[in-house]
Amino acid sequence: YIFSNGLRMQGKFMRDCVDAGLDFFRFSIIGYNAETYSKWMSSPNFERVIDNMKQMRSYATDCRIASYHLILDTDNLEYEKEQYLKLSEGGLVEIWKMHNWSGVYEIGVNERKGEVKTCGRPFSPDVVIRAGGLDGNTGAVAPCCQVLGRDEEAVLGHTSKNTIEEIWEGEEYTKLREDHTTGNYPDYCRSCDFLLDDPEVLVYTNHERDLMKMHGTEFDLNDYR
């Protein structure tokens, strides 16, 4: 599985990835035209990425190619959904409501609504590991992918210093699970909209994407909430 903005997925590099046995690639395309893409992705490469996606779909056989999109304005949801579907041209697609990346971004009118409860991630049988780390360490273990941008607050350990088992059973991870049990969430979780129980957050999908299952996993996060 590879999730990427897809900028480099072209030519020989793309073909080499597919030929090596890649079975799933997801293009992250936030914005349904060049203007909105430039605003949200901070990139002028909208047309290039769309062309890369088309080329990859025409070349790949066993590799499943999908695109991932976020609704920019919930008051304009149906229009944006249709624009994203046009971009996907019948390919695999998933369209989600906007999220705030653990409270880092103020999303205004797109703010999610719902009951606050644990997202389940501190209890689920997966571990998020970064390439880098703090203070010269590597393999930083994070609570989930949503804390991207708040890594200094949210590092639970480093695989360069300890085993995954030691980190999983260690003080920081144990404290995080306790906080999610009591509802006394740490700062890097407290404002995250993944704590909100919003069943309509997945706006549209035409493949086996499940709201409460992460790609490449079999467990259901509802079992850990």
Regions found by a protein language model. Name each.
Residues V141, Q146-R225:
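Flexible mid-to-C-terminal extensions adjoining Fe-S/redox cofactors in radical SAM and related proteins
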Residues Y79-E89:
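Short, aromatic/basic amphipathic alpha-helical patches
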Residues L134-A142:
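Hydrophobic "anchor" residues
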Residues Y1-Y79, V93-W96:
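Radical SAM/AdoMet-radical enzyme domain recognition
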Residues D73-D75, M98-Y105, T163-E166:
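A short acidic, often aromatic-flanked loop/helix-cap motif at beta-alpha or helix-coil junctions
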Residues F13-M14, K39, L77-K81, Y105-G108, ...:
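Short aromatic-enriched loop/helix-cap "lid" or pocket-rim segments at secondary-structure transitions
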Residues M98-D126, R130:
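Structured beta-strand/loop patches that form or line metal/cofactor-binding pockets in enzymes
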Residues D19, L87-G90, P186:
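Alpha-helix termination/capping residues and helix-transition junctions
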